[in-house]
Amino acid sequence: MPKRRDIETILVIGSGPIVIGQAAEFDYAGTQACLALKEEGYKVILVNSNPATIMTDTEIADKVYMEPLTLDFVARIIRKERPDAILPTLGGQTGLNLAVELAKAGVLEECGVEILGTKLEAIEKAEDREQFRALMNELGEPVPESAIIHSLEEAYAFVEQIGYPVIVRPAFTLGGTGGGICTNEEELVEIVSTGLKLSPVHQCLLERSIAGYNQIEYEVMRDANDNAIVVCNMENIDPVGIHTGDSIVVAPSQTLSDREYQLLRNASLKIIRALGIEGGCNVQLALDPDSFRYYVIEVNPRVSRSSALASKATGYPIAKLAAKIAVGLTLDEMINPVTGKTYACFEPALDYVVTKIPRFPFDKFESANRRLGTQMKATGEVMSIGRTFEESLLKAVRSLEIGVHHLELNEAKTAADDVMEKRIRKAGDERLFYIAEALRRGVTVETLHEWSQIDRFFLHKIQNIIEMETVLKNHPGDLDVLKKAKGLGFSDAAIAALWNKTERDVYALRRQEGIVPVYKMVDTCAAEFTSETPYYYSTYEEENESIVTEKPSVIVLGSGPIRIGQGIEFDYATVHCVLAIKQAGYEAIIINNNPETVSTDFSTSDKLYFEPLTAEDVMHVIDLEQPVGVIVQFGGQTAINLAAELEARGVRLLGTTLEDLDRAEDRDKFEQALSELGIPKPAGKTAVSVEEAVAIAEEIGYPVLVRPSYVLGGRAMEIVYNREELLHYMEHAVRVNPQHPVLVDRYITGKEVEVDAIADGETVVIPGIMEHIERAGVHSGDSIAVYPPQTLSDDVIAKITDYTVKLARGLHIVGLLNIQFVVAGSDVYVLEVNPRSSRTVPFLSKITGVPMANLATKAILGAKLADMGYETGVCPVRPGVYVKVPVFSFAKLRNVDISLGPEMKSTGEVIGKDVTFEKALYKGLVASGIQIQPHGAVLLTVADKDKEEAVELARRFADIGYQLLATNGTAETLKAAGIPVTVVNKIHSASPNILDVIRQGKAQVVINTLTKGKQPESDGFRIRREVENGIPCLTSLDTARAMLQVLESMTFSTTAMTEGLVRS
């Protein structure tokens, strides 16, 4: 079937901000799809609220709308643009749910818009648990016994029939939100209540738990001609019961016999045909390891996290082909872009093993519940490729950047046997390391299988790794053993530890003896046909397939897995850096290991190496390619942290020199630079012991800001108000010693301002200045940022500009620079300087029109900004107001305090743009998922230090007709100021207490500022956790004040005439 000529304009819905369960894989899919549709000659309109994406760049679609992904705003765009069709299957759950809403609201019918790709009925059949179950029964495909419930009573009735354990899955939610496994009544009540609340249709599926079965996934594609193929099948190492997004996954499956493989393949193809899906689809199945029994778990009728993984694992571009299928092309008429020869209807064949390991945010959230279950908790993932499972697994482990270079974890090493067993029986994010430790202690594979339900095949493979450790230990310096160990994926660091040598010794020995990796190509066809894609992985074999060209090359280091503090913004900068290198006439080579992103799409760079970002793995590529130099500015802290080791090994770093990077990162050198330049910063010193920290704090006066040196995303940063808190911090958050000093600074309450600049050694271009709504002390990544600044005087802006230019020149910055200032009155202090690309680069590039990463790269390669038409200073302000609003994933992470502070907690961001600040902020808040109600009740419970300030806010809430509810202390203050208020009891008092009010939906907004209680049992903590009920809870009065401004601009004030007279 040729492509359709009856449609011209297509609206593509993006997936919005990054949250747990919906990350960068949709930027990758959406970018691919928009480009594919443009390639076929269609006009593409994109709507997405996430400014950090490549897909919202103006060149990706013909028109880009960065507006909230809500029924209201998307309907406006449809009415204005009148597209012929809409493609929702690339926007994740957000896109699917919006399509369903637009159809139900009659907007699509009213404007004559057709849904492309998977039809609405198919989406509903796959997503609605009841319809799906009916279809499976019709097809004779087995599903676990289950019941659809809408209330707790119905849940009890089902459990009485089949008994515990049962799995709860809410309908139409993302990443298993609200779901879980219940083994008793208490868990049933809790999980079912939350699940019903979080499901937009108040419906949950309860099913018999088949936890412990092997979990297998098939990624399938089908076109309108009913051609269907399996792109890739994958096996979860963790058994059923753990969300596939939190599971370690291998492709292709390792434990299936041919009969099992065919059985599940046929079921998957039968299901995609019955659903009539046109495009990509993911089928999840559970297989009983001891018989041929299997169950269908679920189907995702859209591009998903698994399809991004399958695309990168096979090289087969699912999203691109899905978009073309949506406009009528068929698999047998499209060429597979990887080989350039075979058609897309050839099923990919793999001659290597791919391993994906999730990256969890628990290094940021120490108190979070680390147990894994049906609700997803990972923020990102890494992928690695090897010739054997062992090699692939070890490469993935060292890609995670969790401070381990092998299957070894200190906590596991020191754990008592009973603790170890518990950690293996109840899966957490570190289970793999405990299994390795158990094998070292002589626990048998059989016992481990019984504890973990993990297939014996994988346990035997891990045992191979452990046995090799012993061989290495017994044969120090033996070259044959060294060769075998490298073949199993051992890192130099792991071998060095077993041989009591340094990592560089092992590396030197290998080079001298010629024990170095070769690079193999990912070609989708197991080398059956020649392939055109320069996409490589390393392995220890004979033949090298990566050919070095004559053209001078530049290597760019990517930013690795997405985690809190280092998100998709860095991938955005990496991609733009690569494009600029190509424009400058060099060959662009990228090294990265994140399967979700655009940077690891093989069509982005001239060569892609899918490798761990460690000194050893990066050096291997450098040794082969001999580049002009390496760029580390765009890969976040991941790349910056490799700079010193690479330079020590003789690598040329391009852009800002290592010495200058160090001057910005090292506290004492930085202070010296500031005093030479005459730029003020808050008083503070460096401590190398607990006693010293206390002495410094008492000298400069509390409150102080404490943090370790060299961190990203404010890890382990805190504001402490007295000696006791400081001691608690020193004991729990950091291990202070002369190698790891702790910084103690005076905490200044003021406005925080953030600036990004581009410098080439002479010219310093400042695209824009952003003012933060939350005062200093809230991490910049968690603050609402506004451009242009709304309250800064010309004098302050001039100071900020002057300091920025002085710093860029004084630190000899070549490339990008990010500075955070705090403004108190007319004084401007520098808080910190990051000599690299930052989180705000995509946002600023888009709203100011200055292509920051592109200019910075050209400056790094030696071009002058003045020759490109830029001059020193702030660029002219663009019309309009733009806000960047952070988005959090708290509903997925239990036991995490949502209060904002110096430690970053947001996973993503959205943009709001309009003509006034209030309108822009309204859009930003709505896009971030905060429901803004023009009337209702606000519940206030604030710390003593905030009471005075809260009075003015409360009065303004009352003036626009909001009812005020408050706890005792706060209520007294309000009454004293003559403001009417209803008292609500504290948590431990009689009903209706504060939690009842929130749970019954009697408050539309909660404002709760920090009473010092970080522990889960404090009242404030429990109030703030009510985000699980989906009510906006603001923990900073600045955010509340901004929201009030929005509400005031939406409502008319109603005051009686006499009131007006009395007040004046």
Swiss-Prot record:
Biological or metabolic pathway of the protein: Amino-acid biosynthesis; L-arginine biosynthesis; carbamoyl phosphate from bicarbonate: step 1/1; Pyrimidine metabolism; UMP biosynthesis via de novo pathway; (S)-dihydroorotate from bicarbonate: step 1/3
Native organism taxonomy: Bacteria, Bacillati, Bacillota, Bacilli, Bacillales
Disulfide bond annotation, renumbered to this chain: none
Keywords of this entry: Amino-acid biosynthesis, Arginine biosynthesis, ATP-binding, Ligase, Magnesium, Manganese, Metal-binding, Nucleotide-binding, Pyrimidine biosynthesis, Repeat
Matches recorded under PANTHER family: CARBAMOYL-PHOSPHATE SYNTHASE [AMMONIA], MITOCHONDRIAL, CARBAMOYLTRANSFERASE FAMILY MEMBER
Co-factor binding comment: Binds 4 Mg(2+) or Mn(2+) ions per subunit.
Annotated binding of Mn(2+) 2, by residue: E298, N300
Region annotated Carboxyphosphate synthetic domain, chain positions: 1-401
Protein name: Carbamoyl phosphate synthase pyrimidine-specific large chain
Residues binding Mn(2+) 1, per UniProt: Q284, E298
Top enzyme category: ligase
Swiss-Prot/TrEMBL GO biological process terms: 'de novo' UMP biosynthetic process; glutamine metabolic process; L-arginine biosynthetic process
Residue ranges occupied by any ATP-grasp domain in the UniProt entry: 133-327, 671-861
Residues noted as binding Mg(2+) 2 in the record, renumbered to the chain: E298, N300
Single annotated GO MF: metal ion binding
Domain characteristics, as noted in the entry: The large subunit is composed of 2 ATP-grasp domains that are involved in binding the 2 ATP molecules needed for carbamoyl phosphate synthesis. The N-terminal ATP-grasp domain (referred to as the carboxyphosphate synthetic component) catalyzes the ATP-dependent phosphorylation of hydrogencarbonate to carboxyphosphate and the subsequent nucleophilic attack by ammonia to form a carbamate intermediate.
Binding of Mn(2+) 3, residues: Q820, E832
Residues where Mg(2+) 1 binds: Q284, E298
Family the entry assigns: Belongs to the CarB family.
Cofactor (UniProt): Mg(2+); Mn(2+)
Gene transcribed to yield this protein: pyrAB
Domain of life according to the entry: Bacteria
The EC number(s) this enzyme carries: 6.3.4.16, 6.3.5.5
HAMAP family: CPSase_L_chain_A, CPSase_L_chain_B
Binding-site list for Mg(2+) 3: Q820, E832
Source organism of the structure: Geobacillus stearothermophilus (Bacillus stearothermophilus)
